[in-house]
Amino acid sequence: MAKPVQIEVWNPNGKYRVVSTKPMPGTRWINLLIEQDCRVEICTEKKTILSVEDILALIGDKCDGVIGQLTEDWGEVLFSALSRAGGKAFSNMAVGYNNVDVNAANKYGVAVGNTPGVLTETTAELAASLSLAAARRIVEADEFMRAGRYDGWLPNLFVGNLLKGQTVGVIGAGRIGSAYARMMVEGFKMNLIYFDLYQSTRLEKFVTAYGEFLKANGEAPVTWRRASSMDEVLREADVISLHPVLDKTTFHLVNKESLKAMKKDAILINCSRGPVIDEAALVDHLRDNPMFRVGLDVFEDEPYMKPGLADMKNAIIVPHIASASKWTREGMATLAALNVLGKIKGYPVWSDPNRVEPFLDENVSPPAASPSIVNAKALGNA
């Protein structure tokens, strides 16, 4: 028998039982569920990662839906339990769902939700922040000051790289990659080289227009080029930001060989998925190339880092906070809750999961729809 876990209960007499495996930012998501007669149970266990057994205890004998997190293992065991309890939906509070066995969810008829369309800009902002912090060696300088080592100005103290006029490389020019590229091009007047299987016409038009604006005002125009291969980006870019999906073709996309292809003083940024980088190879490269710098928000074996990474002064490492702006995290919680609510109430699936603004306007009621169900087609309700 599963050991009971600590919970906080809202609207105890609600008709539908919805469980959240973690406390989530804001209260709008709770209120939206309560307004539709849901009893909301929030797990308050002091654990960063809940085990399968913990979640089984939360599901119990009757559960209409669960809001969960990327750190949880949602497979055969949990989906079968949720189905037996009468559950109709599970939603990650995340865009990604690598932690979810969608085939198992399909087998038991459980809808799987995610939260795209709300974290594009905030993720791109963090990638841009890491780029600037790495280029100007901000973290090293901060640690230097806090250690009381500053005796006065020196001409060679923490000399970094000027971004203006350099080339930013983007691998994966989807929504986040394109938003990052626009920030770096317009914010720092960098030239762009990008690689994507699909042409990013909108991004190209943006850079072209900005280049024409600069030229008209007597400045050197920025340029763009779509690379024919990822290796081309790695060889030519001064700052490289990774924004691919994670699948078999992108696992260890950056490895020992590709690291060698980069400039000795290049900057590598990853706010996408940890396993796209061979982290052990990266540690070796950082050790052997002290002018090479990296900014990481995600890790190959998260929450763990490969041995030696934390010791690298030329690495900036942050704990998966790309979406950690107040508006974004509250929006993610709202979308996840509405995914579950929509399936409980029998609502249709929203037509465009990347255009979710109508669900996020706090001044109006959200549409009667599930914002994003990744297996809607498989379940026959696309």
From Swiss-Prot:
It is an enzyme of class 1 (oxidoreductase). GO terms for cellular component: peroxisome. It is found in: Peroxisome. The keyword Acyltransferase does not apply. Its EC number is 1.1.1.29. It catalyses: (R)-glycerate + NAD(+) = 3-hydroxypyruvate + NADH + H(+). GO terms for biological process: oxidative photosynthetic carbon pathway. NAD(+) binds at R175, I176, C271, S272, R273, D297, H320, I321, A322, S323. Induction: The appearance of HPR in the cotyledons of cucumber seedlings is both developmentally and light-regulated possibly at the level of transcription. This is Glycerate dehydrogenase. It comes from Cucumis sativus (Cucumber).
